[in-house]
Swiss-Prot record:
One of its GO terms (biological process) is translation. Keywords: Ribonucleoprotein, Ribosomal protein. PANTHER family: 54S RIBOSOMAL PROTEIN BL35M, LARGE RIBOSOMAL SUBUNIT PROTEIN BL35M. Belongs to the bacterial ribosomal protein bL35 family. One of its GO terms (molecular function) is structural constituent of ribosome. This is Large ribosomal subunit protein bL35. GO terms for cellular component: cytosolic large ribosomal subunit. InterPro entries: Ribosomal_bL35, Ribosomal_bL35-like, Ribosomal_bL35_CS, Ribosomal_bL35_sf. It comes from Lactiplantibacillus plantarum (strain ATCC BAA-793 / NCIMB 8826 / WCFS1). The keyword Ribonucleoprotein applies. HAMAP family: Ribosomal_bL35. Gene3D superfamilies: 4.10.410.60.
């Protein structure tokens, strides 16, 4: 039986931490910053941890 392939689109967008959590960039960060407060812009700079219900799905895509 052949090996399962990693979904390349998901591999470019998500990273798995050492403990198995999945990190991704925040949404709403490409443009239109004039409508956001300074606090919103600052908080969007970091990375986000994917919520628990979606983790299993992303692990299947990433084959980890």
């Amino acid at each position: 039986m052949p090996k399962q392939k990693t979904n390349r689109a998901a591999a470019k967008r998500f990273k798995v931490t050492a403990k198995g959590k999945i990190k991704s960039a925040n949404a709403f960060t490409s443009h239109r910053f004039h409508g956001k407060t300074k606090k919103q812009r600052r908080q969007l700079r970091g990375t986000a941890i994917i919520e628990k219900p979606m983790v299993k799905t992303y692990h299947k895509l990433l084959q980890k």
